Amino acid sequence: MAAPEAWRARSCWFCEVAAATTMEATSREAAPAKSSASGPNAPPALFELCGRAVSAHMGVLESGVWALPGPILQSILPLLNIYYLERIEETALKKGLSTQAIWRRLWDELMKTRPSSLESVTCWRAKFMEAFFSHVLRGTIDVSSDRRLCDQRFSPLLHSSRHVRQLTICNMLQGATELVAEPNRRVLETLASSLHTLKFRHLLFSDVAAQQSLRQLLHQLIHHGAVSQVSLYSWPVPESALFILILTMSAGFWQPGPGGPPCRLCGEASRGRAPSRDEGSLLLGSRRPRRDAAERCAAALMASRRKSEAKQMPRAAPATRVTRRSTQESLTAGGTDLKRELHPPATSHEAPGTKRSPSAPAATSSASSSTSSYKRAPASSAPQPKPLKRFKRAAGKKGARTRQGPGAESEDLYDFVFIVAGEKEDGEEMEIGEVACGALDGSDPSCLGLPALEASQRFRSISTLELFTVPLSTEAALTLCHLLSSWVSLESLTLSYNGLGSNIFRLLDSLRALSGQAGCRLRALHLSDLFSPLPILELTRAIVRALPLLRVLSIRVDHPSQRDNPGVPGNAGPPSHIIGDEEIPENCLEQLEMGFPRGAQPAPLLCSVLKASGSLQQLSLDSATFASPQDFGLVLQTLKEYNLALKRLSFHDMNLADCQSEVLFLLQNLTLQEITFSFCRLFEKRPAQFLPEMVAAMKGNSTLKGLRLPGNRLGNAGLLALADVFSEDSSSSLCQLDISSNCIKPDGLLEFAKRLERWGRGAFGHLRLFQNWLDQDAVTAREAIRRLRATCHVVSDSWDSSQAFADYVSTM
């Protein structure tokens, strides 16, 4: 009887508190109470009024509310604001109560957006609080507009920050300045421990102050925090200074900006102990580099970039772009001769004794040893029909820009992250591609490194880097490649539509250098682009040779290689060490996905990759075309002989109408567990003869678990033929079937369901029916799906079959 007595005591306490708080409420709160009490639903309105009164005084009553019995607490939960609702979560769970429905309703009412159908929301509280944090940070939500969001006792940013797992920074770096402000120190400290993914979308040009704030933010979140992934999306015209800032900070480099406050965490960490050398010490290079050559080549690269920008945007306002430190100021230590070459005395604004800023990490010898071969390839980031222009040193250029004023940034990432090259005699002309990659007629190899990072520090770096639709200039590509060569903590790299062009060769060299580093963790590479200077299979071979420890490789090229047109001027081909004919060594690939451009692919090249990938478990070929069915058969035979661990095989957008014997060969493979033929025109020829052969092969295969046949014009006849796979005399263990986009009508689906019922095989897993002609007879379709759900899990949609008119006409 103790429990009921406690419940009654708590209930009486709640009523007493509610009555007292109601009497103490203001007239504004009391007026609605009278009107509510007089209505036909007086008891619920009164209880709700009491609950609102308790919610309004939670600062005093919180501990008592937490101790309320479960039924009463369950009625109060929807009346709490988001701050107390979040705080009471643990107590509610102990009482067997869930707040997920409340958070979902808050999402629908306040966020007014529908989550993606591909997103599986496991915790609506975390999702709401994360979105709420972003809206408050950007100023896109007014917390005073709704009582559920407004409470003077709580800071919206601080209270929601611990739920933020990913943060998106957009446009003009909105939110970066607010987060690093002193009043939000606790917010930033909380983010440093909770945030895992940092995303940048649609970035625009930013000023120096915004970049300085971003520098501090990245330092706190990456170097002293838990951020492990940085992703950049949709940046059509990347600002070089900002892009290189994000890259270098992600790689673990830190150098405070001019006039910026010192890092408190760095001071605490370094107090009482000597600095240690971590895995990044390989980047620091020699303590006495040849600065003259480095500075000379860096100055030439930067001068060329300024000249190119001036031509492209002659009317751009100076205030809208981040000014660069003057070349003369950044190269003070290079000597007076170099000063005179780069700037006339009239343009010098450097104070005596200015210290030269440190420079970027030195490339490893394996990366720099082959850079001389780049003279054969253009350095542009996209296909160039014209040869690159040549330029002279900037001596005597009156338009050279310098940094002026006390607010100018004297320490810039440009000062210590750039590729350097060997030495050239004064007065000689240099191509920008040769300067950028250091191909200077085989000069001293020691000149191919970078100046040491004497004043910069190395901290923890991210493990996942993603660049989506971010065009990379030569300068940006060189910076990325140089950082990659020693980025041993990197585990996954995604480069999607970045316009690499011939810079892909530098990327391969940097990946080869990274693979040679002790402790290299790179295991996943995703590469896609419109064009490639190498055919996709040669590029795949080069990547596999450069990264033998890679586990996941996804590569896609939309258009044929330039090498397919040898008549293009300047198309001299890749360096010989990139496309060597030597046999590919054994690698660790487990997953290989390839998207091919139009044109027949040489089967022997693909077979050579497959033979070296004995651990391959998943293979996906998209839009692959072979010269003949025999070539396709050669690939399948290679899979059977050399890839014994292969479990999943996928073909998409391939014409396999003439490869029916090869398809049967696959279906008889007793090692494959899942096969996908997506839009492969399987039943375009001889369907009456091929379908029985296909069903017979599947009935004898006891290892195949999943078969996906979307977009193959199966039709009702083909579906009914497939039903025989589940007959009583079948040894098939198929449990997943995808027959989407196959011109299936309701009557055929109903007959398919009846046959499954008749054979009584029981539930066989999942059946996918997207985009079929089920709307032609809605009643029959519902009956068919009802019957099917007794034997399997059905996933369908309401699709307008009139969209398939063209497909229907093509089958007439």
Swiss-Prot record:
Residue ranges, compositional bias (Low complexity): 354-381
User: Which InterPro entries does the record cross-reference, listed alphabetically?
Assistant: Leu_rpt_41, LRR_dom_sf
Q: Which residues carry this modification: Phosphothreonine?
A: T327
Query: GO BP, one example?
Result: protein ubiquitination
Q: Which UniProt keywords apply?
A: Leucine-rich repeat, Phosphoprotein, Repeat, Ubl conjugation pathway
Keyword Repeat listed: yes
Q: Any transmembrane segments, and where? A: none
* Basic residues: bias regions: 387-401
Q: Where is this region: Disordered?
A: 267-408
Which molecular function terms from Gene Ontology are attached? identical protein binding
Q: Which residues carry this modification: Phosphoserine?
A: S155, S276, S326, S357, S373
User: Which positions are tagged coiled coil?
Assistant: none
Q: Which PANTHER family match?
A: LEUCINE-RICH REPEAT-CONTAINING PROTEIN 41, MUF1
Quote the protein name from its UniProt record.
Answer: Leucine-rich repeat-containing protein 41
The scientific name of the source species is Homo sapiens
Identify the coding gene.
Answer: LRRC41
